[in-house]
Amino acid sequence: MARVDNIGLAFQTYYVYIMTNKGNSVLYTGVTSELENRCTQHRTKNYPDSFTAKYNINKLVYYERFANINDAITREKQIKAGSRKKKIDLIEKENSNWLDLFEIKVGTDWL
């Protein structure tokens, strides 16, 4: 969904995100324009045969915002190409306790 800035121009926000399971043993990186909806899909196993459903990926531990979809896709690919250690370092720099950011942010003006 496009948002409107303070002078009435529509703009879109894109997100690169990392989710994990309860034990933080499996990491999933994705890109979306609707982070709250996408997290809900993962959490409710909307696609039961998907990777995220199979490995119970339901905890949002990291996300970045982008104004340009191409920048978001480039960043997603960069994160996916990195090692597990690099992903963990990225998460721990912003969210050292691996809190579920969805639980903290849902319903707020975080998007």
Model-assigned labels for residue ranges:
Residues K77-I91:
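Short arginine-rich
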Residues M1-Y47, A53-Y63, T74-K77, E94-L111:
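GIY-YIG nuclease catalytic motif and its immediate N-terminal context
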Residues F66:
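Short, surface-exposed polybasic/aromatic micro-patch for ligand or macromolecular engagement
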Residues I69:
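C2H2-type zinc-finger recognition helix
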